[in-house]
């Protein structure tokens, strides 16, 4: 059977490969920033508060995501640690990015005298949507798949053929946990936006708490 394997390289720029992973991750971040800036204005902050935070948060999130990934895949780097600095092929962990970005957010809001909880409420729906988008970067990189399964099981889910084909990793089919998480996070985005539109029912920080609860249920199912 001929499998339709996706190419992780989108195109080459002056001979340098540009990966779908990077394009998708950056697209998710850009959308999250835009949505957060609109919400910031709605609650009385400035767009610049969001854009300025990105100068703090984005580097911290990237470093956190990389360190988290390397820490749990150290056997891949122990013999060639210089590879730690190369991320074009992927190797970023969402959880580490959230930790790094969260630390940056704490110090940024203290510096700007902005409520940390308000900022978290602003960001939470956008972040979970960016995570939903980012999981497709993992798919293009042949990452974030789950336990072994059968092709028949995947076909019974009525998934598109290109997804089924690309869940064949080294001859074994796997659960598309990237897809499960992506769909779950899109639903989470909708729920959090609806909650945010009911401020009289919620206290400061409870939209963010909703994000934590929603995403925790996702991890219970998709994490090994």
What are these regions (language model features)?
Residues 1-223:
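A feature for loop-to-transmembrane-helix boundaries and adjacent hydrophobic helices
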């Amino acid at each position: 059977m001929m499998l339709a394997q996706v190419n992780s390289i989108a195109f080459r720029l002056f001979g340098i490969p540009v990966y779908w992973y990077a394009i998708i991750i950056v697209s998710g971040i850009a959308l999250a920033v835009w949505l957060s800036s609109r919400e910031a204005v709605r609650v009385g902050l400035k767009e610049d508060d969001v854009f300025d935070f990105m100068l703090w948060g984005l580097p911290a999130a990237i470093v956190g995501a990389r360190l988290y990934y390397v820490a749990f895949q150290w056997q891949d780097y122990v013999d060639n640690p210089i590879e730690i600095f190369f991320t074009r092929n992927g190797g970023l962990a969402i959880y580490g990015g959230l930790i790094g970005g969260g630390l940056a957010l704490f110090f940024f809001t203290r510096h700007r005298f902005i409520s940390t909880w308000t900022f978290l409420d602003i960001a939470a729906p956008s972040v979970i949507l960016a995570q939903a988008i980012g999981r497709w970067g993992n798919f293009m990189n042949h990452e974030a798949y789950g336990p072994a399964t059968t092709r028949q099981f995947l076909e019974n889910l009525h998934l598109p053929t290109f997804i089924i084909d690309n869940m064949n990793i080294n001859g074994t089919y796997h659960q598309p946990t990237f897809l499960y998480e992506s769909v779950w996070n899109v639903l989470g985005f909708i729920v959090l936006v609806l909650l945010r539109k009911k401020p009289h029912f919620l206290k400061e920080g409870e939209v963010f708490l909703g994000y934590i609860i929603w995403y925790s249920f996702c991890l219970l199912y998709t994490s090994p």
